[in-house]
UniProtKB/Swiss-Prot annotation:
Disulfide bonds join C5-C19, C9-C21, C14-C27. This is a cyclic peptide. Pfam families: Cyclotide. There is a cross-link at G1-N30 (Cyclopeptide (Gly-Asn)). Probably participates in a plant defense mechanism. The lineage of its organism: Eukaryota, Viridiplantae, Streptophyta, Embryophyta, Tracheophyta. Keywords: Disulfide bond, Knottin, Plant defense. One of its GO terms (biological process) is defense response. This is Cycloviolacin-H3. Belongs to the cyclotide family. Moebius subfamily. InterPro entries: Cyclotide, Cyclotide_moebius_CS, Cyclotide_sf. The presence of a 'disulfide through disulfide knot' structurally defines this protein as a knottin.
Length: 30
């Protein structure tokens, strides 16, 4: 399946592909 977003992203970037840091500071599916 697709990787799950949800890691914190205080630096503004997400390590998980297809995820964006919005709403900050939590990564969500782009």
């Amino acid at each position: 399946g697709l990787p799950v977003c949800g890691e914190t992203c205080f630096g503004g970037t997400c390590n998980t592909p297809g995820c964006i840091c919005d709403p900050w500071p939590v990564c969500t599916r782009n």
